[in-house]
Each structure stands twice: as C-alpha cells, then as structure tokens.
C-alpha cells in the first residue's frame, strides 16, 4: 500500500521485498491496479551485502522510505531501532550517500526520546499518526540539510474529526503548566487523545487551548467551555464530585448504578474501582477516580 500511494505522486518507485512470494504478489497486484511506474526487487538488505546498494544507487532516489520488520526471528515484537530488521542505524551511512531525504515508518510502541537520541541531528520531525483515536504509526523524517531539534507532530486522520498539532520538546519543557484549583459541576473534563500523550504533549495544551491540568501526573484537563476539538480530546461535563474513600464510593455507586469507570493516578485499577463502586458497565455516565487539585477524588461526568 505504501508504494502504491507513492506511485500516485512520484515519477517512479523502486519496491524491495526480500520475501520472494510476497514480492511476486506485490508485483501482480501493482499490475492489476494498473500501476506501471513501480519496479520490484527482492534483495536482502543488510550492511553485509551490496546488491541492494547497487540497485539503489542506479535508481538515484530523491527519497528513501524504509519500513523495517518489527519482529525478531522468533516472531516476537521488537521496538528498538537496532532490533528491527534491517538495522536502520547501521544502514544510515550508506543511505546518506544515495539520498538527501529518508522517511522511516516505525512501530507506534517505539519510544520517541529513544528515536530522537538514536537518529541524531538530521532528524527533522517525528510524526505520530492516529486514526479514530488509535496511534497507528510513527513516521521519522530525516534530511541531510537539517541540523538541530526535531519537530514533534501529531496528526489525527479521521474524516470526521481531523486534528494536527506541531511543537518541540524544548517548547514543552519551557511552558509552565496551569493547574486547576477546583473541579465543580458544569466544568468540562477533557481526556487527551492517545496521540497527544504519545507525543509527550502536556503543558502546551494549557497554553494553546486555555486548559487547566488536574495534577502533574494526571493527564486530564478542565475548562470552563468545551474547546470543540474532538480529534484531540474526549469531552465530558462534570455533574458531581465525591471524596475518594468508602463513603464516596458508596454514594457515587448509588447515584450511578450504571457507568463507565476509569482510574487515573490513584492506587486502584479501573477494575478495582468498578468493584468498589458496585457499578455496572454501560450508560451515558463516566466516573473518574483521579488525583486532582491536590487530593484524590471521584468525578462523575456525562459525555458530550
């Protein structure tokens, strides 16, 4: 699919797949789709072989796209760059001799600070790509001309709730958080998307959208009004708060016999919270157990 998409915007594409049957299947599919500007090769790409390098040099690409295998020889998932196959870090010196631009597609589980450290100053951006709230890929854009800190980009690709945000780690670190002093009925409670959390976007959300963070390690936010960015946040309206403890569990469970529940930054799992509340799953209500405004509490909300 990647090469098929590239072929729609590029003059020509070189597709390499070391697995013979998979390569043959791709070649047949390209032909059936009427794609004529893709050439398929079947090289084993490694620092110890050079057939693939000769082909790549002859092709002279403007961009090199690499999607290394994310499983080891035993079929286990791997997340470190050096554990993927091929090891991109060992190939980079050769790749830079051939092209000025490299795009890597990596596991959504890969650690972004690790990628920034391993890939060095030529890393222009790390892009967290999500669809319908689920992080699908990490894309790393490397350019020979780039030097310095990479941009961190979030992109939600949903047709109905697209969203994008760009920032840098230094901007995040330099932005002071704004903390909520109270949580009351009528407030809007906001849960950031998994893509924002993956990118490490926390304090900037306060500055850019006028939000208040519930506490340092509770990645929930409050606002007087819904910012109206469904691709970035799930929004809830606060109905009532309860103390975190037996009395609060009993009262919240009685008021909300059916609700979704989530524990965040408290010494309970979500399953344990449900057991303490004696609340059945389902319904329009959502009960959060979290640390907020310097104390642990229960926050009962309705979805917006």
Task: Please annotate each region the language model reported.
Residues 1-304:
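SAM-dependent transferase fold signal centered on methyltransferase-like domains
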